[in-house]
């Protein structure tokens, strides 16, 4: 499978700092420009991958972060091969954030100094069950049965078990410092999921919510606070 990414470099200097911006489901690398621009202005190289089944990458299904975790790992090692001194920050959005957290469960190399997870779910099973309940409140079929059918369809069509897509399990094995970000008015992934991820993580971690922000809207509702939290968090990791 061929995977595509954009690699952007700051115009004035060669940097060992690399930000990997991982987009959300049903999106693509080109829609993460607001994040790439900030990192470029801070002197980072920026890698913007198209996840499998998105943008210019190949793939016949959307993995909602699960198989994407392995692609994130591949991009990390591609960066390290180009620059063994690279200092890598992962910045994931929604299911892209889930992919980054799931990658933490795969034991990230020491070149990765920080993970920024914006609006990740706790587990795909829990998120799917919640959405099924919202969509079928007046239906006679129980949520558990609908979820079982959906699990079987995903297993046969995409080849993975959605029950294994569990960032909340992965963060129990995380070692890379992680910043959890979430809008407190998120109607797609409830902010309570972010709070639970923060509580369960065993790595050094911080947590910030954005008042009135919906799904992935923290960077738009309060960009100054958003980037202040991100930049200060990363700066502390560089000092260690």
Regions found by a protein language model. Give the residues of each.
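The serine-hydrolase catalytic nucleophile loop
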Residues: 25-38
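Short alpha-helix in the alpha/beta-hydrolase fold that links the catalytic acid
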Residues: 35, 167, 176, 190-199
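Conserved alpha/beta-hydrolase
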Residues: 36-58
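Alpha/beta-hydrolase active-site loop
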Residues: 62-83
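Hydrolase active-site cap/lid region
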Residues: 102-161, 169
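Short beta-strand/loop motif that positions the catalytic acidic residue
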Residues: 173-175, 180-182, 186
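Acidic catalytic loop of the alpha/beta-hydrolase fold
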Residues: 184-189, 216-217
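Catalytic histidine-centered segment of alpha/beta-hydrolase-like enzymes
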Residues: 213-227
